[in-house]
A protein has these predicted regions:
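Acidic, metal-coordinating catalytic cores used for nucleic-acid/nucleotide bond scission
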Residues: 199-204, 226-236, 257-259
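Terminal peptide-recognition signature
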Residues: 51, 93, 127, 178, ...
Length: 564
């Protein structure tokens, strides 16, 4: 970590989390998730904050998530010099991505991107893929460019990116990931990896060239390790099948699921790419590409040795149960009376196939997202996402505590909120499902209105929220994630459509208001503007005035009010 950055991060950590300095460590900080003084980090390079309550909290937060402002304006912090014209690119890769630059020499360059429509520019880190084909990442406050974070030039379909120093002809195994930074991250841990650039790019041309290197020897194993979002998982299954049809030995690997989605570069920065964890990620990949529910259940049992458990397959809920007596009889029969000569592990696997029962207990898959509470009304709900097979869009809705208390009540509520969703399991099976899901969920605070919440010091609307001068958008789970605060509005009656693009504001409307209503219109406008701060004004001055708009019929009272 660069000394200036280290000094600023340390200063903020001591002030914001009440850490105590103990040798090479910062300890006894207040965990933002559980509020206990169990947070710690390595003082010499405080990249990751971790909670010491492994079983009850186990929070893990990268410093980029805590202080994003320190990882945005790379050109300002590291301007180019005659000695190092690509200082910003170097700093971005070193500090933002956690890479050892000695492994990346001569494979990237610092360039510039200019958006004429927005009249904005930024430095970029550019990686060549082939002659006339390159990809670059915007590094200076990329949020200014909307959804654009990177640029492509040239046709990359069928190709992949690889480190210039990577000798594919010497590899027994090659990982195929989405992003260039993911491939570089795996390279730091001795894993040969190439980048497809996007999950839907099947590298047919690159694989053909690779096959030519292995004409007289065994081809390497392909490990498809795309992102763990919906698109990444769908294409992992698709490309594994296609590559096998093309004559390749193929399997998969998956990053672990977490509320904050992590890619391979994120895991590299969190020191979570050691050999034992890599085995676990390959296990996740095997589960993803399992051909049927039985195969997936057997994989899970062989790893966990649990005799009974629920699992998901194709967005349906299944239940696995092992009949021990039947298993022992099947094992003895296979091991000692079978026609095939099998070792003990092979006999166990075959006995499992004969003695395990897999039953579908719901034709959809319910996932508890979070617990939402209204402290004023003392009401609470569990917010669920219900996934369906066959690409049917998921639905999200609430369950009360009583609706989760028995299988029959759960079935009624599921039928009510999810068309065609049926739960056929028992109350005991539901209890075990909830015991697995509920302890891990977070709590989301709620308001029953839209507007300013005095309690949470935030403006909460339908799709946007503002707190401490920062704008937040509703996330995929229908709440506003504001760091230590998670918040949503329960209001369903008032719907406001707000535009957060300030450059699209039409500044002519005040003139039209003046032409139509004159000074009285501006008095009403000033009052309306003041209502945005009514709670703050009441807090300081004890009250906020009323405004009465009166006039002759047809004088425009309703028009003025509706406009405002």
């Amino acid at each position: 970590m660069q000394p200036q950055l280290h000094q600023e991060i340390t200063r903020r950590l001591l002030a914001d989390f009440s850490f105590k300095e103990q040798g090479d460590w910062l300890r006894q900080g207040v965990c933002p998730d559980c509020q206990k003084k169990e947070l710690y980090t390595y003082a010499i390079s405080p990249w990751v904050l971790r909670c010491g309550r492994l079983n009850k909290c186990n929070a893990e937060i990268h410093i980029k998530e805590v202080y994003p402002d320190l990882f945005e304006s790379w050109s300002d912090r590291y301007p180019p010099t005659p000695e190092n014209p690509q200082a910003a690119a170097d700093a971005y890769l070193r500090e933002m991505r956690g890479f050892d630059l000695s492994l990346l020499r001569n494979c990237y360059a610092q360039e510039n991107y200019y958006d004429a429509r927005r009249d904005l520019g930024s430095a970029t880190v550019r990686f060549p893929l082939a002659d006339g084909v390159w990809w670059e990442r915007i590094v200076d406050r990329p949020q200014r460019f909307g959804d654009r974070k990177a640029n492509f030039h040239g046709a990359y379909s069928g190709l992949w990116w690889q480190l210039p120093t990577l000798k594919l002809e010497e590899q027994q195994e090659i990982w195929l990931v989405e992003g260039i930074f993911d491939a570089i991250a795996l390279h730091h841990h001795g894993i040969a990896a190439v980048s497809l650039m996007t999950c839907n790019n099947y590298p047919a041309q690159a694989l053909s060239q690779l096959a030519a290197l292995f004409v007289d020897k065994k081809r390497p194993l392909l490990v498809w390790a795309l992102d763990n979002d919906k698109a990444g998982m769908n294409y992992t299954r698709r490309w594994v099948k296609r590559s096998r049809d093309d004559g390749w030995l193929s399997t998969a690997a998956q990053t672990p699921y977490s509320r904050t989605k992590l890619d391979w570069n994120d895991l590299h920065q969190r020191d979570r790419l050691n050999p034992d964890l890599i085995k676990k990620y390959r296990y996740y990949g095997s589960l993803l590409i399992a051909p049927n529910p039985n195969a997936k259940a057997l994989l899970m049992h062989e790893r966990t040795e649990r005799k009974e458990f629920h699992f998901e397959f194709d967005s349906r809920l299944y239940w696995f149960k092992l009949d021990i007596d039947r298993y022992m009889r099947a094992f003895d029969n296979v091991m000692y009376n079978g026609k095939e000569e099998l070792d003990e592990e092979e006999a166990k696997h075959k006995a499992l196939q004969e003695s395990a029962a897999v039953v579908e207990i719901a034709n959809c898959y319910p996932t508890t997202l979070y617990y939402q509470a209204n402290t004023i009304t003392d009401e609470s709900w569990y917010y669920f996402r219900i996934n369906f097979p066959d690409d049917t869009p998921p639905i999200k809705n609430t369950f009360t505590g009583s609706q989760l208390s028995s299988g029959s009540e759960f079935k009624k509520r599921l039928l009510h909120i999810a068309q065609g969703g049926i739960f056929t399991g028992t109350s005991q099976q539901l209890d075990k499902l909830l015991l697995k899901q509920l302890p891990k969920i977070k709590t989301v605070q709620t308001t029953d209105f839209i507007g300013y919440s005095k309690e949470y010091r935030a403006y909460v609307f339908n799709d946007l929220a503002v707190r401490d001068g920062r704008l937040y958008t509703l996330n995929e789970e229908d709440f506003f994630d504001m760091g230590k605060l998670s918040l949503k509005s329960l209001n369903q009656s008032v719907s406001l459509t707000l535009n957060d693009n300030l450059k699209q504001m039409d500044s002519q409307w005040p003139q039209l208001l003046w032409q139509a209503f004159g000074a009285k219109g501006f008095v009403a406008l000033a009052y309306w503007f003041g209502t945005m701060f009514a709670e703050q004004i009441r807090d300081k001055h004890k009250s906020f005035p009323f405004l009465e708009i009166v006039g002759e019929p047809g004088s425009g009272k309703t028009t003025l009010i509706e406009f405002l």
